[in-house]
Amino acid sequence: MEIIKGWSDGGCRGNGKEENIGAYAFYLEYWVDNKLIHTKIDGDISYTTTNNVEELKGCIELLKAIKDKSIKLEVYLDSAYVLIGITQWINGWLKNGWKNSKKQDVANKELWLELLNEKNKFSDIEFIKVKGHSGEVGNEKVDEWLNAIMDTPF
């Protein structure tokens, strides 16, 4: 049996400030018959961004990195914003013309649409919540990579 497991993360140092630095990262594992076959880790840096934008970009880029959309995919997220947004809130936003529960425009609409588009390309996808900084190996790995990206001077 084939399965892909993926973790994504996003962060921003100076979130809410005019000048800040942020990044997203994702980590993928490809398993066949309970044997780890291949891994991939990637990410990128951004300036003048937010935590939520980077969390969304991490998940989007994770989904884009997978060529075979028919393989079962488990996406592990420590971001409740992305997890609840893509599994619950988005249905209401679509029905309500992209207004949130306070009747305000949904933030990051274009990224949500891109994430939904990428999600819908998969035949078997599950989003799973993990607690950040709790020792969960995949989450720790992607968090380390994310911080390394933000620490890099280029």
Regions found by a protein language model. Name each.
Residues M1-K57, K64-I66, D143-F154:
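RNase H-like nuclease fold core
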Residues G11-K17, I60-K141, W145:
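RNase H catalytic domain
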